[in-house]
Amino acid sequence: MSKVARRRKVEGVKPKITHGLPVRARLKCADNTGAKLLMIIGVHGYKGRKDRVPTASVGDMVTVVVKRGKYDLMHKPFKAIVVRQRMPYRRKNGQWVVFEDNAAVLVNDDGTPRGSEFRGPIAKEAIERWPSLSVISAQVV
């Protein structure tokens, strides 16, 4: 299979966004699963270099550990999608986007949300890349 054919199979095309969340960054949990504070322990699809810290941005799937929240969720790895980041990034139309906090939502392995509602605004880039998030999100920025 050629590289072009492989690119077409991707669920959503990822725009170039400034990476603002390295491994061990703390995120708010923006859904109602019972988790409050998350910590990134890995970035899915990151191909780096020796001794380089993997980083994530809006729309990336990351592996997280729940640091504060319900006891049955604590200290277990989950998959999450980053929906907000503090570091400014530029959209194709020239607009700069900045959020007040870093936030993610917990998802299953296939990218469907584990919670039934999202708190706060969700970045448009995350919705375009993961269409299953658009069903629950109330505010899209």
From Swiss-Prot:
<keyword id="KW-0689">Ribosomal protein</keyword>
<dbReference type="GO" id="GO:0006412">
    <property type="term" value="P:translation"/>
</dbReference>
<dbReference type="GO" id="GO:0003735">
    <property type="term" value="F:structural constituent of ribosome"/>
</dbReference>
<comment type="subunit">
    <text>Part of the 50S ribosomal subunit. Forms a cluster with proteins L3 and L24e, part of which may contact the 16S rRNA in 2 intersubunit bridges.</text>
</comment>
<protein>
    <recommendedName>
        <fullName>Large ribosomal subunit protein uL14</fullName>
    </recommendedName>
</protein>
<keyword id="KW-0699">rRNA-binding</keyword>
<keyword id="KW-0694">RNA-binding</keyword>
<dbReference type="InterPro" id="IPR000218">
    <property type="entry name" value="Ribosomal_uL14"/>
</dbReference>
<dbReference type="InterPro" id="IPR019972">
    <property type="entry name" value="Ribosomal_uL14_CS"/>
</dbReference>
<dbReference type="Pfam" id="PF00238">
    <property type="entry name" value="Ribosomal_L14"/>
</dbReference>
<dbReference type="GO" id="GO:0022625">
    <property type="term" value="C:cytosolic large ribosomal subunit"/>
</dbReference>
<comment type="similarity">
    <text>Belongs to the universal ribosomal protein uL14 family.</text>
</comment>
<comment type="function">
    <text>Binds to 23S rRNA. Forms part of two intersubunit bridges in the 70S ribosome.</text>
</comment>
<dbReference type="GO" id="GO:0070180">
    <property type="term" value="F:large ribosomal subunit rRNA binding"/>
</dbReference>
<dbReference type="InterPro" id="IPR036853">
    <property type="entry name" value="Ribosomal_uL14_sf"/>
</dbReference>
<keyword id="KW-0687">Ribonucleoprotein</keyword>
